[in-house]
Amino acid sequence: MANSIQDALYLSFEREQWAELRKSVPLTLSEAELTQLKGMNEKLSLDEVTDIYLPLSRLLNLIVGAKQQRGLVIDKFLSQQAPKSPYIISIAGSVAVGKSTTARILQTLLQRWPEHPKVDLVTTDGFLYPLAELKRKGLLQRKGFPESYDTKLLGEFISAVKSGDNNVKVPLYSHITYDRLTDQHQVIAQPDIIILEGLNVLQTGLDTLVETRRPFVSDFVDFSIYVDADESLLKDWYQQRFLQFRHGAFNDPRSFFHHYATLSDGEANAIAANIWDTINGPNLQLNIQPTRERAKLILKKGKDHLISQVLMRR
């Protein structure tokens, strides 16, 4: 059934077909820059950037340009200049699918187009309730589920930047302490484009209770991307990443997960599998994957994190 829905809604491109749509867009990313951009456990190459992300940056540049031209037409009609409003691109998908890497690559490529040199990247992690609040609400085991986010604060932020407000503060999140930072903020100062990356950015007001319904992130997004992969791959990638964190971030005494640093491979693998089966997997099945067909573009990953298919809304 899902395939028939996708066939009706999307144009499908195999990797080679999509790569041809790059046309003459030059590759301006070096191997050293790519190393800094890619996430843990991702075998990302310049070929992947050339075949997948350059055509995507070309598409987005054309779409953003059309939106900017439309804005000029509206300004002319109203005989006044409206406040600068950023073009907002959202990137959704499961834990461990590589959303952050996709976001960083697109940010780097898009800001090298002269039409929109200022591109900011915002992650919704900063809008998770503080750790103490999650514990108080009994939501620690549902972290990442829609109810664990301060959607009011997130909505206020996205509304402010879309309205053209300047110097809008965004809360930051520490993956070491597993908590929102209280003394640091990201400041958004009227960029040309905002890339908003998070698990549930395709969620709509229809997904919430009627009495709490309010404008949601998706109401303000101009272009949405969903990074997709089979759950068996996602679980495997999550377990691999957990094992790598055990030798890296978990060794930091400040880490919320420091107690996992001394686990054996077998113990760590079992705990990671349990976290997936009880938290990340159910969240994917109940809240994240059902929003996939709301995206304007779906990037379908296969083994080794390589994108094998691109689906674009008709």
Swiss-Prot record:
Residues involved in ATP binding: G93, S94, V95, A96, V97, G98, K99, S100
Predominant subcellular localization, coarse grouping: cytoplasm
Cell location: Cytoplasm
MF (Gene Ontology): ATP binding; pantothenate kinase activity
GO-annotated biological processes: coenzyme A biosynthetic process
Keywords for this protein: ATP-binding, Coenzyme A biosynthesis, Cytoplasm, Kinase, Nucleotide-binding, Transferase
InterPro entries (UniProt xref): P-loop_NTPase, PanK, PRK/URK
Pathway recorded for this protein: Cofactor biosynthesis; coenzyme A biosynthesis; CoA from (R)-pantothenate: step 1/5
UniProt similarity note: Belongs to the prokaryotic pantothenate kinase family.
Name by which UniProt lists this protein: Pantothenate kinase
Organism: Shewanella denitrificans (strain OS217 / ATCC BAA-1090 / DSM 15013)
Organism taxonomic ancestry: Bacteria, Pseudomonadati, Pseudomonadota, Gammaproteobacteria, Alteromonadales
